[in-house]
Amino acid sequence: MSDDNFSRGDHSDRLLYCSFCGKSQDEVKKLIAGPSVYICNECVDLCNNIITQELSQISEDGESSDELPTPAKLSAALDDYVIGQDKAKRVLAVAVYNHYKRLRHQGKTDTSIELGKSNILLIGPTGSGKTLLAQTLARVLDVPFTIADATTLTEAGYVGEDVENIIQKLLQNCDYDVEKAQRGIVYIDEIDKISRKSDNPSITRDVSGEGVQQALLKLIEGTVASVPPQGGRKHPQQEFLQVDTSNILFICGGAFAGLERVISDRTEKSSIGFSATVKSKEEGRSFSEAVHRVETEDLVKFGLIPEFVGRLPVVATLSELDEEALMTILSQPKNALVKQYQHLFELEGVELEFTPESLREAAKLALERKTGARGLRSILESALLDCMYELPTRNDVVKVVMDATSIRGETAPLMVLEKEELAKNA
């Protein structure tokens, strides 16, 4: 049948009807044909109106405007994965909520008031949960996320990574969708390692310290970065992608070892004379106690340039994890290490049991090694290595029990054989 039969006023062979509303071609202005299906112009207009209404309820970043989690919900989501650090969670939750609330209402509020961006600085010892906090926030908000290592960055023109590479990694993680990338989260780790070597500006060029801080300034504050397209050098004829970093949330984290001494020098200046208080090194404040009193001048004294500190107005401090916290980390969070290894053993058809003493011993070892929660995996991996080597070739083991001595490596884990289990239950 020719297209002529679908136009209004054509009374040739037979009368055609809209498959959706049932009106004939004489009752509408236009009838559009598909494979054995027809739709009139009125139904097309109705469909367009429905789509327009639905799109108006969707915010620019693809989420419903009422789906932005409140600070309380964000903090609760962090509780599922990160143990302790309640103050840091609260600071992060409020900062992230305000950041994305600002993005959702851009252009909708009083144009005379421009809301600034508040990037975040996380200060805490190794293994205290800095990276995990940032990762969890990105997962909860369903936004692109990338981690950059500040120690690999150098000024443009020197051997090492340029700061623009950070944005390229973010683009890669969202399939080069520029709009999505411009609302993502970037976590820059080891930010304390790019502190300048002394308080006074150096005559020689510091390309991996102060130079990197200078290069990061514009990126963090907001600039348009030129990033090679997908394929990079393979397609040099393609134009560079322009990414506006004004709405990207930057979270910088570092251990800042030695910062407690800088803070103590400021807060506990010894008096002179007979009233002077003599303190031994042992009496000095611990990192966790001192770091909560950190001020901008302490970070500048440590080696961050004032302009860089000014771009990170929100500071969240994390405490050192104690033995009880490490034990909880092993077993309580949704992705706890104990649960991960138990699932791994389940895939072999074997039950894995950890005694309370074994968890305490693993926590003690992590404290001794000063590796925090990050060191727990290597401790369990080492203790379970022989079991994971043997089990795939054995079908007589039904259960493995870990105690304190097996965690220390003094004895092998207890393997319960199938016949022993049957005899016990008989």
UniProtKB/Swiss-Prot annotation:
Zn(2+) binds at C18, C21, C40, C43. SMART domains: AAA, ClpB_D2-small, zf-C4_ClpX. Pfam families: AAA_2, ClpB_D2-small, zf-C4_ClpX. Residues 5-59 form the ClpX-type ZB domain. One of its GO terms (biological process) is proteolysis involved in protein catabolic process. ATP binds at P125, T126, G127, S128, G129, K130, T131, L132. Belongs to the ClpX chaperone family. Component of the ClpX-ClpP complex. Forms a hexameric ring that, in the presence of ATP, binds to fourteen ClpP subunits assembled into a disk-like structure with a central cavity, resembling the structure of eukaryotic proteasomes. ATP-dependent specificity component of the Clp protease. It directs the protease to specific substrates. Can perform chaperone functions in the absence of ClpP. This is ATP-dependent Clp protease ATP-binding subunit ClpX. The gene is clpX.
